[in-house]
A protein has these predicted regions:
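Alpha-helical secondary-structure segments
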Residues: 115-122, 149-151, 195-196, 231-236, ...
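Surface-exposed binding/hinge segments that line
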Residues: 101, 134-179, 185-203
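Ligand/substrate-recognition segments at binding pockets and active sites
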Residues: 358, 362-429
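N-terminal lobe/hinge region of extracytoplasmic solute-binding protein
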Residues: 43-93, 124
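Aromatic-rich, solvent-exposed beta-strand/loop patch
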Residues: 109, 155-171, 192-244, 268-284
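C-terminal motif of bacterial Sec signal peptides marking the signal peptidase cleavage site
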Residues: 20-23
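Aromatic- and charge-enriched surface segment that lines or borders ligand/interaction sites
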Residues: 87-132, 145, 151, 297-299
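Structural transition elements
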Residues: 197, 325-363, 379-382
Length: 430
């Protein structure tokens, strides 16, 4: 299994497809059934700065950590919610109270049995520290009326509450209370969850190694997205940090890696032509993000609207992906198959209008100041799209200073409001 990626861009960007390469015959039988034992080698395109799933949203960390950690609920292939560590759940008619009955006998990697107090401590920390929890669940209480029940009560109606708790980004990971008691707001000190694999080692800038958890308690039912049976087959998973795209592709084609992440779209034809790998697709959303906490975009909706009116999303997407099989320009924040999809205001997306943009620039009071624009070459499409965005903004008189950083630094600076005005990023729906 080797990963390429295809993407999506939204404002300011588009929608694309993640491309994955799967090595044929190296990690599965000819019938498609899992083969027991061995090590799965995965080439990640960026380094990991944190293994705390509540704090980091980087998909290279998320995809590693979801093998270690599990949440109360998760997502099926169609995007609907299903139980995971919860046996069942109920939502009150006013969408304020979420009651979870817990599965019993679930073991943590340290040998302890999961209890309600672990879930309470975990969800309290997720609400406090995670981007989703702190944004939507502020003021919520987490209680345990009995040994097998946890209740989350929100002060306001949250019709999407279950979806938010099932999100696979900053995971609402259930950890032992003892781990959380020793953790700081910058991260946990121990990586202990309930997932099919347990943490073995992390060599900074080299790799992360996970080992099969012998006492793993899998949910019942047929596998469906992230729900249902989750049977670990390999003895180990080795996630190597391989930031050079050519090396990842070469390693995938040679069989050195079963999975290769985020290969450049320019490598798509070569990978697709190989009988040694299978190219798989997964949708993701590309976005242009404004810093609204500090700086030029704070309280300046007109300037943000001017940038939207300036951008030709089709040209931007083509600059990043070249092959039209790998993207589509759709301003929706969710895919068309999602129950959370909204069509509101999409008429303004990918509708470049130079005259309208210049009028909005004048109304915004923009004085010609240079906008700090963060991007990275760790994801080649991000850099290529950033250059096209800069060209289009220059054409209407908006100045930008593109700062090229490694992806880990971009993620770090994202939470330093004084160091940037605009950045390009992407989010996987899965």
């Amino acid at each position: 299994m080797n990963k390429l990626r295809n993407k999506v861009i939204a404002i300011g960007a588009a929608i694309a497809t993640l491309l994955s390469l799967t090595a044929c015959g190296s990690s599965s039988s000819s019938s498609g059934e899992g083969v027991e034992g061995g090590t799965v080698h995965i080439a990640l395109n960026a380094t990991v700065t944190s293994l705390d799933p509540m704090i980091t949203g980087a998909y290279v960390a998320r995809d590693t950590m979801r093998n270690i950690y599990e949440s109360l609920v998760t997502l099926k292939a169609d995007g609907s919610v299903a139980p995971l560590l919860a046996k069942s759940y109920e939502v009150s008619s006013d969408n304020k109270t979420f009651t979870f009955k817990l599965r019993t006998g679930v073991k943590f990697h340290n040998g302890a049995t999961m209890k309600a107090e672990d879930v309470v401590a975990s969800m309290q920390r997720w609400i406090k520290l995670s981007q989703i929890g702190s944004t939507f669940f502020t003021g919520s209480t987490v209680t345990s009326p009995d040994a097998d029940t946890v209740v989350i009560t929100s002060p306001k109606a949250l019709s999407t509450g279950l979806y938010l708790m099932a999100d696979t980004g900053r995971i609402a990971a259930i950890m032992p209370k003892t781990v959380i008691d020793k953790a700081t707001d910058t991260g946990v000190q121990e990586y202990i969850g309930t997932g099919p694999y347990k943490y073995s080692s992390w060599k900074k800038d080299t790799n992360i190694i996970l080992e099969k958890f012998a006492d793993y308690s899998s949910p019942d039912g047929k596998s469906d997205g992230y729900s249902g049976a989750r049977t670990p087959h390999a003895d180990k998973m080795e996630f190597d940090f391989v930031t050079d795209g050519t090396t990842r592709l070469t390693g995938a084609l040679s069989g050195q890696y079963e999975i290769g992440y985020s290969l450049a779209d320019s490598q798509y034809a070569q990978a697709k032509a190989s009988s040694d790998v299978k190219v798989e697709k997964d949708e993701m959303l590309e976005t242009l993000i404004f810093n609204k906490q500090e700086g030029i975009f704070k309280d300046n909706q007109k300037l943000r609207q001017a940038i939207l009116a300036s951008l030709d999303m089709s040209k931007i997407a083509k600059a990043g992906h070249q092959n039209s099989d790998l993207y589509n320009t759709d301003g929706g924040l969710m895919p068309k198959t999602s129950p959370l999809r909204s069509e509101s205001s999409l008429d303004k997306y990918n509708n470049p209008d130079t005259a309208a943009a210049k009028k909005l620039i004048q109304e915004s009071g923009y004085d010609g100041s240079t906008i700090t624009f963060l991007t990275t070459k760790d994801y080649p499409y991000m850099y290529d799209e950033s250059m096209e965005i800069q060209n289009e903004l220059n054409a209407v008189g908006i100045k930008t200073d593109i700062q090229v950083l490694d992806w880990a630094s971009v993620l770090q600076k994202m939470f330093e409001p004084g160091s940037w005005d605009m950045l390009i990023s992407s989010y996987s729906y899965s």
